[in-house]
Amino acid sequence: MTDQQLDYQVTVEELSALMKRTAGVHVDPVTLRQQADDGFDTFGLDSLGLLGIVAELEKRYGLGLPEQAERCKTPADFLALVNGALKTGV
């Protein structure tokens, strides 16, 4: 992993694209941003879909994300946890 990757932040737009690509759930990024504190289930994403997103990010960055990432209930919580892990390399 490079220093550039450590500074990288997963955006709402990227999360929206990952939801579509890995779980087949289409959510407009604007809606996702406006409702970031709503549960993933509100958008039709279940725990297996979230697991797919976690796996994709781990593969992309070569970094094991914290186990809590798979249990995040909202997009806001997920992005905060993932971006914190990317920043610290944990």
UniProtKB/Swiss-Prot annotation:
PTM note says: 4'-phosphopantetheine is transferred from CoA to a specific serine of the apo-ACP-like protein.
According to the entry, every stretch annotated as the Carrier domain falls at 9-90
Q: Name one Pfam family in it.
A: PP-binding
Instruction: State the SUPFAM superfamilies in the record.
Output: ACP-like
Keyword Nucleotide-binding included in the entry's annotation: no
List keywords of the entry alphabetically. Answer: Phosphopantetheine, Phosphoprotein
Q: Which domain of life is it from?
A: Bacteria
Using the record's annotations, give every residue carrying the modification O-(pantetheine 4'-phosphoryl)serine. Answer: S47
Q: What does this protein do?
A: Involved in developmentally regulated synthesis of a compound biosynthetically related to polyketide antibiotics which is essential for spore color in Streptomyces coelicolor.
Q: What is this protein called?
A: Probable acyl carrier protein
Biological classification of the source: Bacteria, Bacillati, Actinomycetota, Actinomycetes, Kitasatosporales
